[in-house]
Amino acid sequence: VPGRFDYLLHANDLLSKIEGRRARMLDIGTGASLIYPLIGTAAFNWECVGSEVDKEAISYAKGLIRMNASMLGTKIRRQEFKSNILPGIIEKKEQFDLLVCNPPFYKNKSEALAANARKNKNLHGKEQTHHNFGGSANELWYKGGEEAFLKKLALESAEYGSQVHWFTCLVSKKEHVRTFKRFIRKGNPTDLKVIEMTHGNKSSQ
């Protein structure tokens, strides 16, 4: 949670002072925990919309909203097509001040399993026979991995430039930043920033 809060703090710094209304945030791949809408609502009083492809995650997320009075205005939209990120989620003439996204890290389940095994070995000195993932399949892997997801998001964002003031995304691997920037520039953005975040032994951009 601290790392996610740091991300939203940096994102909040990008927003111009908004008067007379709540800022609107779109969370891509919000997951069952709704962590970004939870933080966005509690810490910044944002109006939040989350997108998700997994039906079970959506059901659980809607349950969280019903149990939390401060989040009753939060909306969850299902992405019907896994090949899309933004189409079908951002409605015509709809405006968002901010988009946030924590993309899938891995290309497939095998890559995720291997990374999890390395992590356990580094932490415990041996490989564990069980696998404990901190997220669902949709949150952890995407065909082509993080780099492919970033390319897709960059290209799709160009189609919604008049509807979203700031597109933001965490990038876990430094080597992907250059690729991401190259594809973002194809859409002729008004501004482009790379902000380094460090929490513990982890670094993100």
Residues of each region from the PLM?
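Conserved SAM-binding loop of SAM-dependent methyltransferases across substrates and taxa
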Residues: 32-46
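S-adenosyl-L-methionine
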Residues: 1-18
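S-adenosylmethionine
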Residues: 53-55, 67-194
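Conserved class I S-adenosyl-L-methionine
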Residues: 20-32, 49
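Helix-rich interaction surfaces within compact, conserved domain-sized segments
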Residues: 200-205
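A general structural motif
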Residues: 20-22, 45, 95-96, 164
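Mixed-charge (Asp/Glu-Lys/Arg
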Residues: 58
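Conserved SAM-binding loop
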Residues: 61-62
